[in-house]
Design a protein with these regions (language model features):
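Short basic (Lys/Arg) and small-residue
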Residues: 1-141
Length: 141
């Protein structure tokens, strides 16, 4: 739902990147709270009811992918997405690192393909490399 709010704010009819940036920040805080409280030891209260466990990759993809895609033409959105992914990756590497790296690269690809002026494209690339290069040498550049 939060990604939908951010995407709606980025639509041409609304064109409100400030709301999308606010939603990205809130999403990062929610995912951080989830990571802080995540436990492998779960008390089963209702053994007859089965609920599939949350997948960390899905949590990040469901939130960040649509926002990065719909905000591809706005440098402030791309930068905020990269910073949010970096915070989650560095704050909880065992939970979010792999998905955050993959989504950061996807965000960079969206930015490169978007119609940015050269200085914006260089800024986004620079931020990506500053935040994500060196963390995991097996990831795409």
């Amino acid at each position: 739902v939060m990604a939908e709010i951010a995407c709606r704010a980025l639509s041409p009819a609304v064109n409100d990147p400030g709301t999308a940036i606010d939603v990205i920040g809130r999403g990062v805080r929610i995912l951080s709270t989830y990571a802080q409280n995540k436990s492998d030891e779960i008390e089963v209260k209702y053994p007859s009811v089965h609920v599939a466990p949350l997948q960390n990759n899905d949590l990040l993809e469901d939130f960040f992918s649509p926002v990065a895609r719909d905000g591809a033409g706005m440098r402030e959105i791309q930068i905020r997405v990269l910073k949010g992914l970096s915070m989650l990756s560095k704050g909880w590497p065992g939970i979010f690192s792999e998905a955050a790296h993959n989504l950061a690269f996807e965000t960079l690809e969206h930015a490169i393909r978007a119609d940015h002026i050269d200085s914006d494209r260089c800024l986004i690339k620079s931020i990506y490399y500053n935040l994500f290069s060196g963390e995991d040498s097996n990831k795409k550049p």
